[in-house]
Amino acid sequence: MAAAVEPEVEDPLWSFVRVLEKRDGTVLRLQQYGSGGVGCVVWDAAIVLSKYLETPGFSGDGAHALSRRSVLELGSGTGAVGLMAATLGADVIVTDLEELQDLLKMNIDMNKHLVTGSVQAKVLKWGEDIEDLMSPDYILMADCIYYEESLEPLLKTLKDLSGSETCIICCYEQRTMGKNPEIEKKYFELLQLDFDFEEIPLDKHDEEYRSEDIHIVYIRKKKPKPPS
């Protein structure tokens, strides 16, 4: 399932490029760093979600479902998912911490010739104010359910960003080691307080880029209850 890895000639131990081929034969090139934390590499969930966005079941007939839609990616890291959306016609904001902005901007620059919508990078720390961000049509997130201490800030940001029509597409790898199962359980327990969600069946994922332990979930903010 893994996309190809293309080493950088200058220092392959320090940086390397992951190559992701699109259905139209063009190629996204994603710079990664061998050190610098979890945000500096392309995780499998990001590949699975990126390829899902290209599936006929998601894209629909005629213009792509993301064409001219506003998209915000949370925890973008390398920007893989957001860049895929931008090549499909979406107007995208990829977000992550300050220390990942240079990597995001580098990957935007490397792939700008493929973008048919628009894409820009912004700093966003989960749980903090989102003054300059509007509710998008779609929020995309891949492998963001990772650290227990980030769950509540992440959920606050999802609530703050979500409008009544916002569709959140969350892709995550189900991990069985250590505290991962209880972190995942806590996330969905907290999520259901304010959101409805449904899992997309595996047979709706990309035929090649799929795995039984990687899940795609659609999430929407609950409708307000009418006054009694």
From Swiss-Prot:
GO terms for cellular component: cytoplasm; cytosol; protein-containing complex. GO terms for biological process: peptidyl-lysine trimethylation. Belongs to the methyltransferase superfamily. METTL21 family. Coiled coil: none annotated. This is Protein N-lysine methyltransferase METTL21D. It comes from Mus musculus. Disruption phenotype: Deficient mice are viable, fertile and have no obvious pathological phenotype. It is an enzyme of class 2 (transferase). The keyword Methyltransferase applies. It catalyses: L-lysyl-[protein] + 3 S-adenosyl-L-methionine = N(6),N(6),N(6)-trimethyl-L-lysyl-[protein] + 3 S-adenosyl-L-homocysteine + 3 H(+). S-adenosyl-L-methionine binds at W43, G75, S76, G77, D96, W126, A142, Y147. Keywords: Acetylation, Cytoplasm, Methyltransferase, S-adenosyl-L-methionine, Transferase.
